[in-house]
């Protein structure tokens, strides 16, 4: 079949670029990290105790930076709060401000109750500016006894249970926005929110796994082979679920065979051939899933198991970023004429270029470093003793 490409004259630019790719990537990591802490605080999975509180700090750091790419994308970022002050309830983006603010408050309260005992002890041992800051964070209340500890644990449980649906909505909200745009067939699929949510969980699990191995190596977190296996198990399960969702989504497009299938198939096998099939599905998803499967199939030593898990986590972080790219940018590569394509080549020093995307991706790590100056990632003496006891009783069964 011979056809001629044609694009409308006013339809030649990519509007949503790297900033809109970076935002769902950061928010996905936030969701995955929070999910790890929820599995311990709400569902009582004891093997995740060494990373339960640290995951809260990771989630909080990425949540604080999640909106920065969006603000950089706006022409007038000073007007961003208008979506909250003067909301339009018929606008899909109008509810984002409320959902984000709600989850930010919930997460901050969870961290406050989870770290209250640590902050009290740190305030007693500190002096100068750090002591003043900790005293303010504690709201000038440093009472600590068995009753207050019980209240703290109960509040962490209640708030985390409330935060789970809030986190799910916030993480899947981007997928909901894309899926609701019926004018774009590459985005308009009912599976889009679930694809964004599950891939976000994968990225959060992968990053926490890498940070846990790094901090455990230098003694900042308690080493636990049981915790490592649980994180890798969750990563394998989430990856398997994501593979199913991606496969079902592609089958949905193929068997629906709508008028837009011609442009979607052309997009996949031309413009996105390398980034989708090779980088995302092949190198990112395929290699990582094979590594994770081999980890639980082969009888590996703890060191080899940890190394393979770290490599798989790196591949999955890359895969999730490529997935964001292929959806956000890939969905804008074809013209509204459905027979023409656009070109997009991001530059390094643009306002929304490669350098700014790298800066916004690395910024949460600086925030995490600053947060850990006041909230220690090391387990308390009570937690460490409990963890050693439980690990000793379960090690033979799990290993």
Label for each model-derived stretch:
Residues 1-42, 369, 386, 394-399:
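N-terminal signal-anchor module of multipass membrane proteins
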Residues 2-3, 71-81, 172-183, 248-260, ...:
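Membrane-helix interface motif
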Residues 6, 41-48, 74-77, 113-124, ...:
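Juxtamembrane/interface segments at transmembrane-helix termini
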Residues 14-25, 48-60:
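Loop-to-helix transition at the N-terminal end of transmembrane alpha-helices
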Residues 19-23, 94-97, 192-196, 258-285, ...:
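Membrane-interface transmembrane-helix boundary segments in multi-pass integral membrane proteins
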Residues 24-26, 109-306, 312, 319, ...:
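Long, contiguous internal "core" modules enriched in hydrophobic/ aromatic residues
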Residues 26-44, 54-86, 92-142, 159-163, ...:
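Transmembrane-helix bundle segments that line or gate the permeation/cavity pathway
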Residues 307-399:
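TerminUS-proximal long segments
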